[in-house]
C-alpha cells in the first residue's frame, strides 16, 4: 500500500497542468487518430481480399513508425505552439505518402499492391485537404476574434468533419478511388507542403507580433500607493513633538 501511495504522489498534477493537458497534449493524439482513422475507414470500405488487408497492415505500422521517428525532436520540445502542430501534421502526411510508396514498391510490389497504393494515396489526399481546410478555418476565426482557443476550436472541427467523412465513406464506399489516381501525387504533395508551411508561418508571425504588444502593456494602479512605513513613523513622531 505504501508503494501505491508514493507512486500516486508523483503522478498528481497541479490544477494548471490539468487544465492545459487535455488540449495541449491530446491535440496531437486527436489529429493522429482522426487522420489515420478516416483513411483506414475508407480503405476498409473498399478492401475485399487478404492481400489488400495485408497492405493496410504494413502501411499503418510503417506510417505510425515513421511519424513518431521524424517527430521525435518535436515531442521533446517544450512550449509547442500552433506552428509546431501544423508542422507535425505536415510530417505525418509525408510519413503516410512515404509508407505507401515503400510498401508498394519495396515490400509487396504486386498488381494488387499497386491498386491498394492508389486507394491509399487518394484517401491521404482527401485527408490532407480536410486538415488544411480545418487549419484555414481556425486561422480565419482566430484572426477575426471568433476563436480564442486554437486547440479547442480545432478539436471540434476535427471530430465533426472526420467522423462525418468516415461515416459517409463507410456508407457509400470508396471503391471508385481504386481505379485511378485523383491527381498527380507529386504535384499535390508539393502544393500541400507549401500551403501547410504558409499557414505555419502565419501562426508564427502572429505569435511574434503578439509578444511585443504584450510587453508594451503597462499596469496603471487605480489608486495612489500607500505611504511607506518610515514616513508614517515620522509623521507620528512629529505629531507627538508638537503636542
Curated annotation (Swiss-Prot):
Q: Which domain of life is it from?
A: Viruses
What is the designated name of this protein? Answer: Uncharacterized 26.5 kDa protein
